[in-house]
Amino acid sequence: MKKIIFILTCLSTLGGHLVAQNPKWFKKAAKAQISIVTMNEKGDMLQSGSGFFIDKNGTALADYQLFKQASKAKVVSGEGKEYEVEAIVGVSSLYDLVKFRVKTDKDTPALTISDRMGVKHEHVYVLPYPTKENKMCVNDTLHDIQKFNEKYGYYTLGRPLDEKYLNSPVMDEEGEVLGMIQRKANASATTSYAVSVAYGNTLFTNGMSSADNDLNAIHIRKALPADEADIRTFLFMTASRSASTTYNQYLNDYAEQFPKSSEPYTQRADFYMAHGNYAAAEEDMNAAMDVAEKKDEVYYAFSKLLYELNLKPGYT
């Protein structure tokens, strides 16, 4: 663990074409950058890298390869605060992106995502992860922009950047983030590439995500979809694939996202009943009754649970 914390707080020196003076927004932007260590189930380190927060709720972006096969991950912010990654929000293996959320009860510093795609030959700044040895932005230009998905940019920058710039944000003059530096195609590449952060922010799970091989290659719990109908589909498809503790957490997340719906409580009551936690099951059925508009449906669900319970051998 000491090795992991050391890597998180002391990333290697980064080289590049540094500006003579950082823009006025640099210090604030640097606080949103994070160092990341991914681990296996035993807590052994798999990989280390960097990324950055894109909203105050602890949502961040990094490269997908960094999280592949990981069971756990920890991050340290530019302010020196340590967080645990609690959920994977979405992925794109095609664009080597992962969107994830850390566990926090306070606002996190975050970069502002530009609503512009940017224009060719626009001056930009590349922000390396700040260290004592390297606290300066890198000057660059948007040499070319390829549009994808109708409104997002895949950027070619004017000069090559070291691999240690991977996942660094590409900022415009106003201090808003346009892109994230991508992995080099080959060691002799004379340019660098960045993918739209606005596109990365569109990555979410959906009802069919439990069958997504790219998501399943990351063994960290997934964030639930935003739509309740999608959550029900996700839970149905996840039930046989997830460990009981993970599935229980999904049910807790469901109740937290939709506290005024009776469905998360009846589903969690079913789970508790199946695992012999009858007091918790009764508590959830009462909670479902409190919020239900159609109370007859809750009575039916409860009676069904009691019937199934009485069919169990040895139950009296």
List the model feature ranges, each with a label.
Residues 22-26, 108, 180-245, 250:
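C-terminal cap/linker of serine protease catalytic domains
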